[in-house]
Amino acid sequence: MDDCIFCRIVSGQIPSSRVYETDQVLAFDDIHPMAPVHVIVIPKIHIPTLMDLGDERMKELDALIVAVQEVAKVKKIDQKGFRTVINCKEEGGQVIFHLHLHVLGGEKLRDDLN
C-alpha cells in the first residue's frame, strides 16, 4: 500500500534502522522510543490489524513471535526481560494500520498503561 508508512519502510522508500529481517518480517528501531530499547516488528505483507489475521495468516504471527525473540537477543534484553505490545484499532491505541508489535526494554518498565 503506497499510503502505508510501514509498507514504504519495507520497500526501502523510507529509511529505517533495521535490527532484524527475514523474508516475512522486518524489525527496526522506533524513531520515537518510549524506552531505552524500542523496536517495531512488522510483517512484510500489509495486514491492517490483529483482527485481520485469519487462519491463512498464522504463519505471519509465528514469524513475528520468532522475530521478537531474535530482537530481544540482538538488543541484549532477553535475559532481564522486556515487554511486547500490540495495539489493535483506534480504541486500542493503534495509530498506524499495519499490524506491528512493539518490543520495549532496557530498563524496569512501569506497570501503568498510560
Language-model segments: residues:
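HIT superfamily nucleotide-processing domains
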Residues: M1-N114
